[in-house]
Swiss-Prot record:
GO terms for biological process: killing of cells of another organism; lipid catabolic process. Binds 1 Mg(2+) ion per subunit. Its cofactor is Mg(2+). This is Dermonecrotic toxin LsaSicTox-alphaIB2i. Mg(2+) binds at residues 25, 27, 85.
Length: 276
């Protein structure tokens, strides 16, 4: 999965997919009452990027639905996965359940079209804080109460805080999550990736590949250089988040990687651990 980073304006959906992304990451900011409000990152953000592009969340969802609904004039067949980077650090811990509930209602109405031929992309809810695990509970229970528990088949999870992997496992246990787990690891592109290294990403890959691991997929962020792309591929990650999808696509075309990796399509289940 080539994951376009910080896609917060509607026009950027086309821009990133046309550069080679089959997945996008979108920031979601919340108001004081835990309503998802804007697709907005704000300052500071990655180097060489404009941090302040935004849309109203529901307007973005409608555009995303068009981009991922077969037969729509805006449809992109290859856009198959969307990561919502949920900026819940602005909320109190006790608001996490409400944030999940309100997020589910927004997605149900504006993305899934109340279960009636809505967008088809798989969705990852990426949460920055382990203590906000109740967001998952609120999301799940709301879809069930609204009569659409089947939509959870399209939803996965990520805790994005670079926490100790054992602690991440405990948070999932509390949330009752037993699958659909993506694990992110990384650092802003403003800091050279070698300073962080790939140790934790490799630890996540080892968990993914072990018989008793809880992780299904691992992605590394934010990668804009060819050398770092190669290192991440050598570590056998499933996804790379990038500001430059064309760079990742180029490296995947190199002879060393062409035979080993391919770009994921809609038929590749993002919740299944890939067996070599």
């Amino acid at each position: 999965w080539i994951m376009g980073h910080m896609v917060n304006a509607i026009y950027q959906i086309d821009e990133f997919v046309n550069l080679g992304a089959n997945s996008i990451e979108t920031d979601v900011s919340f108001d004081d009452s835990a309503n998802p409000e804007y697709t907005y990152h704000g300052v500071p953000c990655d180097c060489r990027r404009w941090c302040k592009k935004w849309e109203y969340f529901n307007n973005f969802l409608k555009a995303l639905r068009e981009a991922t609904t077969p037969g729509d004039s805006k449809y992109h067949e290859k856009l198959v996965l969307v990561v919502f980077d949920l900026k819940t650090n602005s909320l109190y811990d006790h608001q996490a359940y409400d944030a999940g509930k309100k997020l589910a209602k927004n997605l149900l109405q504006h993305y899934w079209n109340n279960g009636n031929n809505g967008g088809r992309a798989y969705i990852v809810l990426s949460i920055p804080n382990l203590s906000h695990y109740k967001l998952i509970t609120g999301f799940k229970e709301t879809l069930k109460n609204e009569g659409h528990p089947e939509l959870m088949e399209k939803v996965g999870f990520d805790f994005s805080g670079n926490d100790n992997i054992d602690q991440v496992a405990k948070a999932y246990k509390k949330a009752g999550v037993t699958g659909h787990v993506w694990q992110s690891d990384g650092i802003t592109n403003c800091i050279a990736s070698f300073i962080r290294g790939l140790d934790r990403a490799k630890e996540a890959v080892a968990n993914r590949d072990s018989s008793n691991g809880f992780i299904n997929k691992v992605y590394y962020w934010t990668v804009d250089k060819r050398a770092t792309t190669r290192e991440a591929l050598d570590a056998e990650v499933d996804g790379i988040m990038t500001n430059d999808p064309d760079v990742i696509a180029d490296v995947l075309n190199e002879s060393a990687y062409k035979a080993k990796f391919r770009i994921a399509t809609y038929d590749d289940n993002p919740w299944e651990t890939f067996k070599k």
